[in-house]
Amino acid sequence: MTDYIDSVPLEKAYRLLTHGPTVLVSSRHNGVDNVMAAAWSCALDFAPPKVTVVIDKITATRALVEGSGMFALQVPTVVQLQLTEQLGTTSLATEPDKLQRAQAELFHIDGYDLPFVTGCSAWLACRLVPEPHNQQTYDLFIGEVVGAWSDTRAFKDGHWQFEYADPAWRSLHHVAGGHFYAIGEALTVTPEK
């Protein structure tokens, strides 16, 4: 599993999110782990790298993020479609065995007290940048990226490899009500002469 995981330089971490994927948000606090799906996340800044993600007040993950001051974003693949949907439509508050029922496999990265979801194509460890007004009014959380990794079968040398990789590595893009798209064809602009 970890044979293909490599660190991504922090100055390139924004590239893990610029194509607009659905993400899995994970956090840990007081020995409790949780993972939820989020469709609204994006890169925010380059140096230091920052991201945003919307985490609703009713989610159990939000309490873990606020309690620990840390969260991880990960980019799930098309193989993880059902997992992503299940993690996004069930709550730890009402289903304490949510992660086990979803068969979510978690792993650890040394130096980070966070749960990371196995099988994703990218992972970003984030330290919460407290912005109480944004969090309370808009459910908008800002994180400073303190570590980033990718599965080199999908992202290497600072670039996504979707056009070369097995289609199973494509990222998910949530529309609504269990409807997703997978990232499509790569297009490159030809400079005008």
Region locations from a protein language model:
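Basic, polyanion-binding surface patches
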Residues: 1-193
